[in-house]
Amino acid sequence: MRGGGFDRVWGPAGSYIEGNNELALALIVTIPLMRLLQMHANRPWIKRGLLGAMILTALAALGSQSRGALLALLAMAAVLWWRSADKVRDGIILLVVGVASIAFMPANWTARMDTIQEYGEDESAMGRINAWHMAWNLASNNFFGGGFDVATVENFTRYAAVVEPRAAHSIYFQILGEHGFVGLFIYLLMWWFVWLSAGHLRKAARDIPEARWLSDLGALSQVSMAGFAVGGAFLSLAYFDLPYNILVLVVLGRAWLARRAWIEEARTMPLPDTRFNRLVADLAGLPRPLSA
């Protein structure tokens, strides 16, 4: 905002998301979670504030000039559009928002995004592909991979066409190089089960008034995972904690749904000490509300 859209966005210095690409993916993954909070906010000013925060977060992700961020945003938009009840209306809205956001970006942003189609002329992209080849060859010759920190001169000398050690810049090739095909299979299977569990929440809690928020959590967790799956294909963030936090939310949500916890919570949830609430508690045979 200070640079009027002409500066590249960077993360906090010295943090895990200091790099523009890492920050962009972290921002993108949080947008659906902000939407979840907005959907269940009770006050209009909170809803408006979260809407503004989502717009600014998307602009910040684009302003990072991360090509992976652009692809991740497109993936999330595709999931939202596919699940939309009115695809024509929502498609137009997404298109207008996308065009308006891109119009805010500087000329060097457009030039950088154009390199997606001309990756053969981009030194950064070719370096990543070389690292991917190294990871593939390493896993092919070592059943359980090379362990952590495989970006060494020795490994690139033996398994890469160009001896230029660098990170894999892909969650998939990162896991492949470090843990082999077995590790990659387990990693993908884990996230597939999380996706299925989130889908279960989306469908099973949809018609339960007390648990409808859980249906929204499942649906929007899938949107976040779609963004991470696409954006993470170009970043070494296989151990980034935010997606695992979503995993925990989905697992806990499924356990909460399975034991129908809202029934128990309705009995134990504290209520304001009012005359009406005391009367309701007495009629229902529940403990009276405690005074503040």
Residue ranges and their predicted role:
Residues 5, 39-43, 87, 113-117, ...:
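Membrane-interfacial segments
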Residues 89, 179-225, 245, 250, ...:
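Hydrophobic transmembrane alpha-helices and their immediate junctions
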Residues 91-96, 193, 223-285, 289-292:
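Transmembrane alpha-helices of multi-pass inner-membrane enzymes
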Residues 6-14, 114-179, 200-215, 220:
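Long extracytoplasmic/lumenal interhelical loops at the membrane interface
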Residues 20, 64-68, 166-170, 234-243:
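Membrane-interface catalytic loops of GT-C/OST-like multi-pass glycosylation enzymes that act
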Residues 1-4, 59-64, 81-123, 133-140, ...:
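A membrane-periplasm/extracellular boundary helix in multi-pass inner-membrane enzymes
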Residues 1-8, 15-83, 91-99, 195-203, ...:
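Alpha-helical transmembrane segments of multi-pass inner-membrane proteins
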